[in-house]
């Protein structure tokens, strides 16, 4: 459109100057300016009233401050707490309702004025469309962007549609130049509004990017915290598993200890019974030992008596041997004498002498036989009687006594040894392997001692046998000498057969006697050997009894040691039972406390999972909202209340975290009681304390960040208030300057109007509301005509100030319509209805010249200031 109006190739008919008509309409524009000023003052009053109803009850917080809070706080939780915000902020809703009512009243008053002036049905249809948009915005907040666009299109059609209506009514007075100029101004305003919307949307995009970044950082922090909590839960689960395994191991150990204790008690009872039996057997053995000692004393006395008798018999035998030797010597002497006498006799008278010699020899032989027979008979009788008596007595007494004693002792010892062996075997098997070794050593010693005894007995038997053989050899030698003598005598007495027969008979008797003697000697040797065996056996038994007594003493000592060990083991078992009870109670307390901790952590984990799900849902919703919020303006105002509620909830969450910290501190104090018993538990608890401290530091850091953000917001609000005041002052100064400029421009309206009409200027974003308040009146065209060189400087300063304010007001210049439920927002420049001035039919319209084909865009601030200055001047 602008190129169309600026095209110099297209020719137009010469028109009258339109600025003359604008001068005529100054009176009508003053009244409209008054209404605009009153509306702006009402809006300021409403803004001050809204500032008074702040949720945090702070005097310096405005709508801009709360919107900065929305940009700095967490925007991802908006959807989760929308219902709570609507319930928990009745003051805000009441203040916004009052503000919306005032706006609706102002808009209704303006619409009533326009309806009374023009009576156009299309304007009423536009108001109904706006009412429908308000209903739809209350019903569905997600469709607010489409309703805003529709309302903008209605306003644009309304502003664009009223010009041809005015022209149709005032065809007689107006011209096509007015219509074109009005359409041009409308297109210019539309362009400025579109630029403002583009800037706002760019700012919203920047805000949303910042919020997405903050949301991503917060989600990363939450994921880290969730990971920490998961690691804590895993460590706790591992610790619980180790504790349960340790508990099971201790229970198994306790069971084993109990079983071992019962086994030891049974063994101890068995040892006691075996020891009692051993004591009884030892007492019986002592009694039997005393009896055996008495019997052995008696037997020793009897053996000594028999030894004396044997000595007497041996003395008698030696005497007989001496007598035999003396007889043999006498017989030799007699033989020599007889030989001499016989030789003498034979030499004298051989025959006579031979007869006498034979007779004498017979007599001698008879005498010799008689004497020898007597001696042999006497010796034989004495020997036989003595030997028989001694042998019978010895054999009878010794055999009977020794057999009886031996059998009795043997039976007793066998019984006792069998019983003692059985008992000792049982005790030895039950006690230990060392006792078995001792018993085996004792048995080996007994075997060695018995072997030694047997060897000693064999040696003594051999000695006695050798002595008896020596005696027998001596007697045999004596008998051999006798045989030699007899043989010599036989040789000498060969002639006599009687002597030979007698000699044979004597030899037979001698052989029988020698055999009897040998039998007696052998029987004596056997009896002596038996006697010596019995003596040695008695000595061995005495040795065994002494060994048994030593063993008895050792067993008694072992019994005492075992009883002492039993007492010690019982004391240890009592200590172990006490320790078991204490450890059981401690572990039960620990397990109960850890179960409580686990429950608390599980509940926290569940809450965190729910929170994560909520955050995921919020993330999805935010991603959806990011696509829809590029053109939305009302939800940003709704986020104020939600984020305020979230701040309260964050404070409540901080209190909950403090309570959790207190609970964890109490749990740690409970756990510190068991530090001496389990050092590993202390380490894990210290790690948990460190983790909790780190979380607390994170929470305190977040608190400090929130406090810093609040302080920065307060500073920003103060700066904004100061800037608003400075802007008001600048506006007042500009109004004064514009009044002076108007006074100065009245003298030169035509020259400066043509110069300024060719200079287009872009309307700033901050003054969009004032441009919409003033309609397409002809009085608005005076502003470029009455401009002086100071106006450029003022417009530049105004643009710079608007840029500075736009830096701080990026997040706060949000549009608001009559259907907004939120408070603390600036009124939207699009939703406010423009006020049209009354167009008179009889007004003289000045047509522009042909040379002014390029039209100048109006500056809205200058237009408004000029109208206000005109109105004041006319008053």
From Swiss-Prot:
Gene Ontology molecular function: any one: actin filament binding
Miscellaneous comment in the UniProt entry for this protein:
Present with 391 molecules/cell in log phase SD medium.
Segments for region (Disordered) = 47-67, 127-152, 738-831
Compartments (UniProt record): Nucleus; Chromosome
Instruction: Specify where it is mainly localized.
Output: nucleus
Q: Which organism is it from?
A: Saccharomyces cerevisiae (strain ATCC 204508 / S288c)
Instruction: List each coiled-coil range.
Output: 177-333, 397-438, 456-752
- Whichever gene encodes this chain, its name is ZIP1
List, alphabetically, the GO terms of the cellular component aspect: chromosome, centromeric region; condensed nuclear chromosome; cytoplasm; mitotic actomyosin contractile ring; myosin filament; myosin II complex; synaptonemal complex; transverse filament
Question: What is the protein's name according to its record?
Answer: Synaptonemal complex protein ZIP1
- Which parts of the sequence carry Phosphoserine? 481
Per the record, where are the segments of Basic and acidic residues compositional bias? 738-751
